[in-house]
Regions:
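Structural preference for solvent-exposed beta-strand-turn elements
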Residues: 1-167
Length: 167
């Protein structure tokens, strides 16, 4: 039953397409209660998948960023795959819900992703009033920043760290 998960699926489809990530999502949760646990669990699982796919991070660019325009919306996203989890999330939604998705759960999703992946993640809405476009732009900007951060660079022979190690 997708009731309550449509906006999340649409957002993850944007993440998949704009980050060039191979992603299939199936959510079995307690959506009849509310979407909190399902959205949070989806973020945890995605974060774990990102951590696993990143492997030892040798040759990885580590940092990625994107400023993404979508109609009247402008979103900044920056990623550091250095192993230290952190989320800086700056968004002021003007509605409590988009479809059946509580807008406060967008923060919960990205918090779960950043901590499960061990990434430093900054998402800032620079402009925008349409909550649907803001959420969609966040996921697409995150995808593009993560694609850049996890990209390989032949000039990087080990991990990109002055300490010689990444968490």
């Amino acid at each position: 039953n997708l009731i309550g998960a449509e906006q999340l699926f649409l957002s993850l489809e944007g993440f998949h397409q704009h980050g060039f990530f191979d992603l299939k999502v199936r959510i079995d949760g307690d959506l009849q209660v509310d979407g909190h646990h399902s959205v949070e669990d989806c973020g945890i699982v995605l974060g774990q998948a990102i951590r696993e796919a990143a492997g030892d991070k040798k040759g990885m660019k580590r940092f990625g960023q994107c400023i993404l325009p979508m109609d009247a919306t402008l979103v900044l996203c920056a990623v550091d795959m250095g192993g230290r989890p952190w989320l800086n999330f700056d968004a002021a939604f003007t509605a409590e819900r988009v479809g059946y998705l509580d807008t406060e759960l967008v923060h919960e999703f990205f918090y779960a992703v950043s901590y499960s992946a061990g990434m430093n993640l900054h998402i800032k809405v620079l402009d925008g009033q349409n909550n649907h476009h803001i959420i969609e732009a966040m996921f697409k900007a995150f995808a593009r920043a993560l694609d850049e951060a996890t990209g390989m660079d032949g000039r990087i022979t080990d991990v990109l760290s002055t300490k010689g190690t990444l968490g």
